[in-house]
Amino acid sequence: MALLLGVDTGGTYTDAVLIRDETTVIASAKALTTRGDLAIGVGQAVRHVLEAADVSAGQVAMASLSTTLATNALVEGQGGRVALIYVGFKERDLQAHGLAEALNGDPYLILGGGHDHAGAELSPLDEDALVAFLTAQKSQVSGFAVASQFATRNPIHEQRVAALVAQVTGRPVSASHQLSAKLNGPKRALTAVLNARLIGMIDRLIGRAEDVLTDIGVTAPLMVVRGDGALISAAQARARPIETILSGPAASIVGARWMTGA
């Protein structure tokens, strides 16, 4: 008998459900969402559902978490302060697709480099300017985003920037080519900025949720619901929190389809 545990943190309530063999709901429970530390509400809901089902935490084979945290953070303009490294673009490109608004005064660097549509280097990466920028900003931001011209055709400049960010600052970095395959540079940059902004809060939520589940006795791996309803590992969600946007609504739709047999 495989027991699956699902937890959803909403704006008001945190819900937990236990499903047996992917076919039968054996118990559900609810707790108030604890906004200061969402994991507290997660723990309360999980304890309630285990008690209602009269099963031990060790019987849970997989745990999944859906959350509106990323969605709410972007809508409310929350998240960490980040810096954008914009390689091979012009200053005016910041005005495209809401990129300047997303930065909202956060620092950025227009850096020499980039490639053409065929992946050929247009100009060398200006590493001296990059290192100077990283040194100045490393204590001022929680993370970095990098978008290079035509990085989806040749990501080497983004990869080099990411390596230097790690070396000089030790901060997390979101590279646009790892988040989107689209050619549109400003859109990729926007995705990278939003991802970088969310990394800290999603990392804290997942870490605390894992700690709470471990304390309860749940040893099963924690999965996170993606915005399309699929499950990704906790490690993937930590690196790409942008994929958890619409996690909560997606979980609701998947659940409704399962319950109705649609």
Tell where the protein language model's regions lie, with residue ranges.
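N-terminally biased helix-coil "hinge/interface" segments that flank
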Residues: M1-A262
